[in-house]
Amino acid sequence: MRRTAIIITMGLTTIPVLAQRTKNTSPEQTKPSTTMETPKGYTYGKVGASPFTMKDLDALKATVLFGPEDEKYLRMAGEVLKDQTDAVLDLWYGYVGSHPHLVHYFSYKGQPDMEYLGAVRARFGQWIMDICNRPYDQEWLNYQYEIALRHHSTKKNATDGVQAEPIIHMRYLVGFIFPITATMKDFLAKKGHSAEDVEKMHAAWFKAVTMTATLWCQPYVNEGEF
């Protein structure tokens, strides 16, 4: 595969949006893949245990009103999104690139690290599929804690061996819930589903993103206070 940089410019910052294209094919000939290569640094099922228990997760699910119907509509969303992940990531990376205070977390001495951005992008695409298709079991819970540690100073930059800001501040984990939710609805509506199905997919996505962002905040909170 040949990695092609597509430049997106928004606001004051320009960053490349990295997309995969098969060698010797034109953009018109390239169709979105329905399968994803395992991203570098993606270690699902190979991480330590989360201190958050399944009982705790059940209570969190109840708090955001997440139930079996949401699981059903997340699976539907996974089918809708599986060939749109690059487009979703283009939009999200454009959003990050348009805000210097966000791209700052992927930078060293004021310069964005393009390889780092590319590696994170690949895992971000996998996260979209995981949030839709993975069962929210102990293995999933463990990996949310691993993701949390990779945002926190505990493991920030370690996965990719880069020099960049040593922590992503918790306020942006929470603040990012809205743009990641608000921008998804148009993508969910692109495959001809009824308005009701789109609303239910979007609601399930919102609940799932809220839960995962909440779980990612755990390392930032004093023991016993999360």
Report each predicted region and the residues it spans.
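Short N-terminal segments immediately surrounding and downstream of signal-peptide cleavage
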Residues: 22-36
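Heme-based O2/NO sensor domains and their adjacent alpha-helical segments
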Residues: 57-62, 67, 82-187
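Intrinsically disordered, low-complexity terminal regulatory regions
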Residues: 32-95
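N-terminal signal peptide c-region/cleavage motif recognized by signal peptidases
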Residues: 14-16
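Sec-dependent N-terminal signal peptides
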Residues: 6-11
